[in-house]
């Protein structure tokens, strides 16, 4: 079945290559673009909320519409093309700058994962999105090169939404794999691959972020798409790695699939979107993080990077559960049980945490660093917010709750 699927994917790619217009490529500097994900440890961070906006990362951008905007689709819809273009262009040019990349390097990081939506490279007629993000992604690659960082380009939003989350660009029903959406996604992926696969700084491209198999994404169809994405990258540059999301399935359940290929599994780990997890003690949070490594990532036959995780121990951050939704932690989300108070945890800085909260946050972060480096490494979510305590790496670093050197430990050997 998969052999036949691979043949179909290659045929589709040949048609893409024949019909596609020339796409500018990010220049090479003569250095190798490879990073050995089988032997080297990824230590990095995501640039969430920049080229794909999210209400909880930049709430002021969404609040400025006067209400009703719940994702980038509705943000652009409410503002209209001209105003959306102006607001988003201002955001892209100011939210992340070269100094951010310099600070990442100073923190000992070696990777940055940069989300981008399909509409930036393969817009679809009739949709409200605006484009222009790709120029900033090009600039980011230049900044990363200067800072000595490798880049993972992440296709974060797919046509129809691959997960129904606001981070896909369009909150609501999952319609990816309906109609022509998979082919449209491949067109977007191919545009990114042709632009970046031969860069000396982009070592990997992610096929699609968080396709939601429990939510209805067909796993066999997803695998077919992965075959096509791998063929595309390999055709352009065999040393460029394909990152594949586990689709919210146990990462070891993908064993045997594409084994031996230049691929890395991407798994995401949060302990705040489930009431059972929110009720745990700090000791249990640590044990849960460690068990992700021992029971799952270490059991994979491929490199595994924990591509998203957080220092937050609550879901209190404003709009984290979506505009219009409150928090499970304080019992205001639907009919959940109250576990604690969100005061001081919805907005602001970890500087305002109590001494115990600070200690628990540092301990939890260190446990995750230890656990995720037992396999192939990690990418923290996210580098910068407008004030989401526990989620903002810059804020955590400034307050010594994230190690200022990735190997520095105040709480060593928690997973031993």
Swiss-Prot record:
One of its GO terms (biological process) is glucan catabolic process. Keywords: Carbohydrate metabolism, Cell wall biogenesis/degradation, Disulfide bond, Glycoprotein, Glycosidase, Hydrolase, Manganese, Metal-binding, Polysaccharide degradation, Secreted, Signal. It comes from the Eukaryota. Its main location: secreted. It is an enzyme of class 3 (hydrolase). It catalyses: Successive hydrolysis of beta-D-glucose units from the non-reducing ends of (1->3)-beta-D-glucans, releasing alpha-glucose. Its cofactor is Mn(2+). Monomer. Beta-glucanases participate in the metabolism of beta-glucan, the main structural component of the cell wall. It could also function biosynthetically as a transglycosylase. This is Probable glucan 1,3-beta-glucosidase A. It comes from Aspergillus niger (strain ATCC MYA-4892 / CBS 513.88 / FGSC A1513).
């Amino acid at each position: 079945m998969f052999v036949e699927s691979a043949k179909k994917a290659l045929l589709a790619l040949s048609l893409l290559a024949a019909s596609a217009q020339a796409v500018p490529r990010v220049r090479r500097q003569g250095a190798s673009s490879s990073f050995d994900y089988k032997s080297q440890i990824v230590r990095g961070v995501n640039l969430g909320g920049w080229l794909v906006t999210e209400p909880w990362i930049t709430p002021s951008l969404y609040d400025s519409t006067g209400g009703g905007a719940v994702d980038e689709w509705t943000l652009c819809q409410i503002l209209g093309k001209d105003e959306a273009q102006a607001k988003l262009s201002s955001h892209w040019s100011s939210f992340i700058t070269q100094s951010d990349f310099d600070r990442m390097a100073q923190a000992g990081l070696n990777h940055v994962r940069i989300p981008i939506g399909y509409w930036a490279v393969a817009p679809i007629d009739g949709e409200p999105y605006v484009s222009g993000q790709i120029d900033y992604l090009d600039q980011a690659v230049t900044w990363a090169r200067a800072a000595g960082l490798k880049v993972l380009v992440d296709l974060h939003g797919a046509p129809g939404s691959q997960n129904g989350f606001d981070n896909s660009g369009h909150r609501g029903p999952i319609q990816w794999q309906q109609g022509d959406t998979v082919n449209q996604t491949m067109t977007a992926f191919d545009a990114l691959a042709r632009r970046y696969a031969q860069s000396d700084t982009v070592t990997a491209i992610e096929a699609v972020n968080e396709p939601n198999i429990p939510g209805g994404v067909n796993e066999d169809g997803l695998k077919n798409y992965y075959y096509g994405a791998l063929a595309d990258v390999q055709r352009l540059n065999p040393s460029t790695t394909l990152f594949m999301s586990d689709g919210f399935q146990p990462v070891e359940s993908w064993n045997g699939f594409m084994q031996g290929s230049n691929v890395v599994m991407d798994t995401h780990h949060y302990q705040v979107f489930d009431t059972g997890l929110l009720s745990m003690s700090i000791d249990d949070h640590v044990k849960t993080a460690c068990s992700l490594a021992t029971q799952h990532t270490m059991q994979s036959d491929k490199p595994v990077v924990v591509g998203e995780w957080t220092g937050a121990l609550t879901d209190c951050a404003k709009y984290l559960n979506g505009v219009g939704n409150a928090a499970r932690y304080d019992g205001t989300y639907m009919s959940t049980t109250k576990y604690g108070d969100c005061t001081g945890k919805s907005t602001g800085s970890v500087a305002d945490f109590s001494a115990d909260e600070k200690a628990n946050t540092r301990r939890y972060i260190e446990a995750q660093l230890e656990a995720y480096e037992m396999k192939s490494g990690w990418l923290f979510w996210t580098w910068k917010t407008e004030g989401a305590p526990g989620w903002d790496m810059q804020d955590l670093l400034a307050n010594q709750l994230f190690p200022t050197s990735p190997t520095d430990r105040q709480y060593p050997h928690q997973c031993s």
